Curated annotation (Swiss-Prot):
Its main location: plastid. GO terms for biological process: translation. This is Small ribosomal subunit protein uS11c. PROSITE patterns: RIBOSOMAL_S11 (PS00054). The lineage of its organism: Eukaryota, Viridiplantae, Streptophyta, Embryophyta, Tracheophyta.
């Protein structure tokens, strides 16, 4: 059975140009989630719609190298590269997690030239909620 030839101009063919770059966003929120295995940097506008994101894994690091500070710095640079093209001048930074990449990602964000209104630590802390997992015996 032969495949049908898609019509030019049909909606399913995809976009001709990227619609994401058309917006101009003056202020945004940069979320950094730093675990011990990976660092994820997400850039959103003030309403919470994601503009761009990058992680140490998508930046080319695999395995245990994803948890390194250098990988977190590379992920932050990759996420911020797209928002500088969209003229973002101000940003708020929310850092979550206790990984090694949290300071390196913040340093990369500061060097990018975006004016930071505040940096907030939003790491979830239990008020003695769930019982922690059993300690490892090696």
């Amino acid at each position: 059975m032969t495949k049908p030839i898609p019509r030019i101009g049909s909606r399913r063919n995809g976009r001709i140009g990227s619609r994401k770059n058309a917006r101009r966003i003056p202020k945004g929120v940069i979320h950094v989630q730093a675990s011990f295995n990976n660092t994820i940097v997400t850039v959103s506008d003030v309403r919470g719609q994601v503009i761009s994101w990058a992680s140490a894994g998508t930046s080319g690091f695999k395995g245990t190298r994803r948890g390194t500070p250098y990988a977190a710095q590379a992920a932050a640079v990759n996420a911020i590269r797209t928002i500088i093209d969209q003229d973002m001048q101000r940003a708020e930074v929310m850092i979550k997690g206790a990984g090694f990449g949290r300071d390196a990602a913040l340093r990369a964000i500061r060097r990018s030239g975006i004016l930071l209104s505040f940096v907030r630590d939003v790491t979830p802390m239990p008020h003695n909620g769930c019982r922690p997992p059993q300690k490892r015996r090696v």
